[in-house]
From Swiss-Prot:
Primary localization: membrane
Native species: Mus musculus
Region annotation Alpha-1: where it falls in the sequence: 1-88
UniProt KW Disulfide bond keyword: yes
Name by which UniProt lists this protein: H-2 class II histocompatibility antigen, A-R alpha chain
Membrane topology per record: Single-pass type I membrane protein
Amino acid sequence: EDDIEADHVGVYGTTVYQSPGDIGQFTHEFDGDEWFYVDLDKKETVWMLPEFGQLTSFDPQGGLQNIAVVKHNLEILTKRSNFTPAANEAPQATVFPKSPVLLGQPNTLICFVDNIFPPVINITWLRNSKSVTDGVYETSFLVNRDHSFHKLSYLTFIPSDDDIYDCKVEHWGLEEPVLKHWEPEIPAPMSELTETVVCALGLSVGLVGIVVGTIFIIQGLRSGGTSRHPGPL
């Protein structure tokens, strides 16, 4: 089947429900980014950015009704079919900063977890091997073309050369939790020998510049002096 090419793609009303666990979600996406989801516990619409909610609105009851229908259908299919549970896939995680890292400047770490199936996962942040909960936000499960899912977890932080970070991923498809490590890359300080060589090169280049400049000045003066003698009439 050929892929459909389009400038923009909206995925409206993605409804997921699975059992056991009574886990579900209702989301809207635009160009692969989450637009909003319906909080099933609070029964309210949660916008990815508050500004989105100022431009339009969505009645959370629509999402809750979809979840109820999917739950009902799943229960019927489970009772009437000799089903085989789907295989668990091993998710893949990558950690990277949102912006170029400058020590002491606020930034955001992003943990991108792909190939999630089924859509049940724990993503936690560790700083110096200790759990971090402040400044953490994660998206809902976003659908891939192959019907697996991906999810992003964000951690706001201030880079320091004393801190190291890990994104911890736990999933049924993993034999053990996976840790994706990240720490700021600090340029190594120059050694005394390197500093001496750099200074010597700089001094040499400066001396060469002075000599070359002096030569040009002398040649210019000679050329100017010659041009002042009048030729024969």
